[in-house]
Amino acid sequence: MAPHRLHRLIPASVALTTVCATLPASAAYAADTPPTPHLDSIERSLRETSPGLEGSVWERTDGNRLDAPADNPSGWLLQTPGCWGDAGCKDRAGTRRMLDKMTRNIADARHTVDVSSLAPFPNGGFEDAVVAGLKASVKAGHSPRVRILVGAAPLYHLNVVPSRYRDDLIDKLGPAAGKVTLNVASMTTSKTSLSWNHSKLLVVDGKTAVTGGINGWKDDYLDTDNPVSDVDMALSGPAARSAGKYLDTLWDWTCRNASDPAKVWLATSNGSSCMPSMEKDEAGATPAEPTGDVPVIAVGGLGVGIKESDPSSGYHPDLPTAPDTKCTVGLHDHTNGDRDYDTVNPEENALRSLIASARSHVEISQQDLNGTCPPLPRYDIRTYDTLAGKLAAGVKVRIVVSDPANRGAVGSGGYSQIKSLDEISDTLRTRLVALTGDNEKASRALCGNLQLASFRSSDAAKWADGKPYALHHKLVSVDDSAFYIGSKNLYPAWLQDFGYIVESPAAAKQLKTELLDPEWKYSRQAASTPAGCPAGATG
């Protein structure tokens, strides 16, 4: 029985002495820890959807620490470029801190370094940070094993060659290369379902982790006058090992398919073979050491092609349908119509559950809410329905997305997939009408509770070079209490993704102060009023 419930069954005269005398110290401590209603709700959803993936794709842990330097308590939040209020973006303090964090974490490596990203491989200043860290690790007397994994889109990434990147790393490492064992791979788990790795992780010794939306691409983030705005988070503790276990899951598939060039290209160094269980091999049966008191759910997804379903799951969802999710030519809709897909991609329901757990307000900062249609479905019906339910219940919802002016010629070719913010508000209105059965109620909920804007990071409408602001966050925050930072988008995409859900009012306050408040300060100037709402009436 949970310790905090014992007092209900024990007479008041003896309750305190009985609890103190009989409970283990750890249980007594647990009774005093803050409640975690958001994580509890999400964990229930995960156990229903994907019980068999606990410990490999998702895991809840306590005892974590948001990894910030002593002189900067919010330094666990790693933003690029970090030049709020300056359209010229002359001082990119956030980018410098992020690159320095990469180098310092890797420099501390005694045994293992795990890097994952979307292709191409980390280059420019990102590669320099990796190399500098590895050189420092070797100089300290260590011989780290290193895995670097990128997801490759068919045809688009044919020029991403692991052997070439391995050789480049060896050249830059110089004499230190002899002490570094490399596995470098690109992978595509399903060409027909457009599935490949999309996680962005740096895990060192299973003790520290950095994850979020930042890809290691110099041309998008570093060597440009219009850098992408993005965010990662850093932590230490048991949740870092959870990330390592997830990467072991991806590498297990990668190593098993390394002989199939249609799926995997692999290059190694120093005579090594493919390392499918590097994190597990290093950690063994040793429990992960706590470093703090922050509860975290680590949650990822396997996309399509790694595992068909979780056979231990008894999940039986009522899958909704909507005619406007489909386009003229489309693939099988894994997002809206595939129970088995749900069971091996627990992050999907985890994010819906996070939004559903909100009682007062939701902040969403994303590249998009709508996907590239065709070939993907236009939107996630259950996510939109969850948002509609919150709006109808009087919960305030704020959504900031990348400026639609970033839309590429083929939809996802740029940092936006929509032509207008109306695509989001119109869809929300449609789902509200379906939920309430009443146009007037739907309008009241939408006009009274929604704030919707395209992203800006200064008072100027565009960067100083005239380019639109590109936003690549994958961020959801609720009730100033819990939040998700990772690589998973809210729009349909069937990739391998990973992120952390943290419940900590103190950390959520830092997130609000350092990111959400300045974001809205500037983005509200680009706010959109949904059709049918009085000007300035929203939110």
PLM feature segments, named:
Residues 1-7, 37, 56:
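Coil-to-alpha-helix initiation sites in intrinsically disordered, low-complexity, charged segments
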Residues 31-539:
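Charged, low-complexity intrinsically disordered terminal segments
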